[in-house]
């Protein structure tokens, strides 16, 4: 993949995820010396690209699953993405030098509570699961010699077992409250998840000094916020 600077060729573009992770990321962004323009905090704004207190830097706000794609294909130089997304897409153009320590959760297999007491994951040979993460799921089970049939869903995963779509799901779990509310329990943990700083590898080469400086700024921001 070739880095494409597009419009605003000299500006650094940072891709941030919408939703819960954005709230956790903003203290790091501010500790790194950036404040977005006022419309960034306007809930009625449909704007997706924002200027910042640094005239050399813009922020874009996109779906969490899209951050890795924007960075890998050169639409942004730097981003914040969970290692779940990084591993799912497995883009060769993504460099993830820093664990930001935010967005902590886990990717797990869950099934109906009534089945879990008698079920032994170690004896599975073929399973059907609903998941947003078919690639991670297939790789995980293939490593154990288990054939995983993955039904790709983008949401409402917890409904799938109750409606007969599949017996198990693979999804992100934080407190486990959503699983419990839908009669599901975790039966196997696949991956611990946190958000990482991701950098476009080509940008890292052609703007090496600048990218290295930003990585260090975010490293210092993590230390400052954690202190």
UniProtKB/Swiss-Prot annotation:
Catalysed reactions listed for this entry: 1-(5-phospho-beta-D-ribosyl)-ATP + diphosphate = 5-phospho-alpha-D-ribose 1-diphosphate + ATP
EC number: 2.4.2.17
Pathway: Amino-acid biosynthesis; L-histidine biosynthesis; L-histidine from 5-phospho-alpha-D-ribose 1-diphosphate: step 1/9
Entry keyword set: Amino-acid biosynthesis, ATP-binding, Cytoplasm, Glycosyltransferase, Histidine biosynthesis, Nucleotide-binding, Transferase
One biological process term in Gene Ontology: L-histidine biosynthetic process
Compartments where located: Cytoplasm
MF GO annotations: ATP binding; ATP phosphoribosyltransferase activity
Domain of life assignment: Bacteria
Enzyme class: transferase
InterPro entries: ATP_PRibTrfase_cat, ATP_PRibTrfase_HisG, ATP_PRibTrfase_HisG_short
GO CC aspect terms: cytoplasm
CDD domains: PBP2_HisGs
Major place of residence: cytoplasm
Cross-referenced NCBIfam families: hisG
Domain notes: Lacks the C-terminal regulatory region which is replaced by HisZ.
Subunit-level organization: Heteromultimer composed of HisG and HisZ subunits.
UniProt function note: Catalyzes the condensation of ATP and 5-phosphoribose 1-diphosphate to form N'-(5'-phosphoribosyl)-ATP (PR-ATP). Has a crucial role in the pathway because the rate of histidine biosynthesis seems to be controlled primarily by regulation of HisG enzymatic activity.
Family that this chain belongs to: Belongs to the ATP phosphoribosyltransferase family. Short subfamily.
Protein name, as recorded: ATP phosphoribosyltransferase
Organism (species): Rhodospirillum rubrum (strain ATCC 11170 / ATH 1.1.1 / DSM 467 / LMG 4362 / NCIMB 8255 / S1)
């Amino acid at each position: 993949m070739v880095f494409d600077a597009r419009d605003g060729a000299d500006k650094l573009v940072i891709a941030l995820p919408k939703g819960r992770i954005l709230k956790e990321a903003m203290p790091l962004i501010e500790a790194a010396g950036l404040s977005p323009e006022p419309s960034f905090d306007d809930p009625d704004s449909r704007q997706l690209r924002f200027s910042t207190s640094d005239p050399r830097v813009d922020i874009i706000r996109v779906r969490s699953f899209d951050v890795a794609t924007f960075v890998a294909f050169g639409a942004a130089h730097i981003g914040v993405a969970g290692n779940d997304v990084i591993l799912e897409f497995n883009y060769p153009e993504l460099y993830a030098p820093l664990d930001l320590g935010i967005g902590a959760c886990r990717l797990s297999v869950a099934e109906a509570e009534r089945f879990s007491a008698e079920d032994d994951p170690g004896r599975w040979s073929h399973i059907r699961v609903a998941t947003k993460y078919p690639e991670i799921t297939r790789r995980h089970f293939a490593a154990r010699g288990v054939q995983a049939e993955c039904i790709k869903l983008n949401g409402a995963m917890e409904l799938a077992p109750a409606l007969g779509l599949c017996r198990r799901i693979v999804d992100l779990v934080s407190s486990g409250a959503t699983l419990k509310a839908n009669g599901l329990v975790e039966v196997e943990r696949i991956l611990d998840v946190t958000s990482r700083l991701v950098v476009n590898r080509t940008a890292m080469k052609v703007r090496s000094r600048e990218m290295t400086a930003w990585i260090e700024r975010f490293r210092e921001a993590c230390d400052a916020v954690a202190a």
